[in-house]
Amino acid sequence: MSEKLQKVLARAGHGSRREIESIIEAGRVSVDGKIAKLGDRVEVTPGLKIRIDGHLISVRESAEQICRVLAYYKPEGELCTRNDPEGRPTVFDRLPKLRGARWIAVGRLDVNTCGLLLFTTDGELANRLMHPSREVEREYAVRVFGQVDDAKLRDLSRGVQLEDGPAAFKTIKFSGGEGINQWYNVTLTEGRNREVRRLWEAVGVQVSRLIRVRYGDIPLPKGLPRGGWTELDLAQTNYLRELVELPPETSSKVAVEKDRRRMKANQIRRAVKRHSQVSGGRRSGGRNNNG
């Protein structure tokens, strides 16, 4: 069964459909040696050869590809990019290796923000979850420094003007602290760059700590170490798919046996420890990555 080329490439994680359409229009995609045109359809078969900028890429039939989703505890100091020219650690460094697929980040967190970051092998799922029209809730725990009064909280709820347009928190809830150091839990339904920090700064308050604790109804897993990941089970994966009107999966690669879960947890802890040691050695090796 043939499918639109941009749909096949989006599913394989090579960008959103709109991004891929631009790549196709620029003549950067070829199918079996011929430059592709927007609107082309392909049938995914073992002999199909699709190249982007001359590089052969791997694609699979929709029925063959199992949608996988990871919940990752991003530490502060990691970049949301696949490769950094300065050799700084990235969120992809510790993820499990894949064959015939790749992990796609669902949105981004800035370098000084930690917490929940979802990854998936399904490009269409990632793009829909990120799109503002879906209004998927993101919840953050925020420690702020500065005087917070009722007027400022009203402004943050009703909306303030940022350089890229108006913005507001959907909910704001005080969660502890005294004096000018206080914690709040806030929610947004979009993911603009540094939006949480910029909203608080717009009312004269600085953010000193920022942790994403929930994406949709998926919380940051309890007990997950910083730099650790866990794979969502079938029910959680299908919750996310239903949330953005994608058909459910019927199978999962998550092991259900307790012994295998325990083994995986131990492997994650060892990977976190090993990566921390490597990162520490990299930073002390004479290259200054703090600039």
UniProtKB/Swiss-Prot annotation:
The active site is at D110. GO terms for molecular function: 23S rRNA pseudouridine(2605) synthase activity; RNA binding; rRNA pseudouridine synthase activity. PROSITE patterns: PSI_RSU, S4. Disulfide bonds: none annotated. Keywords: Isomerase, RNA-binding, rRNA processing. CDD domains: PseudoU_synth_RluB, S4. The keyword Transcription regulation does not apply. Belongs to the pseudouridine synthase RsuA family. PANTHER family: PSEUDOURIDINE SYNTHASE FAMILY PROTEIN-RELATED, RIBOSOMAL LARGE SUBUNIT PSEUDOURIDINE SYNTHASE B. NCBIfam families: PRK10700.1 (NF007976), pseudouridine synthase (TIGR00093). This is Ribosomal large subunit pseudouridine synthase B.
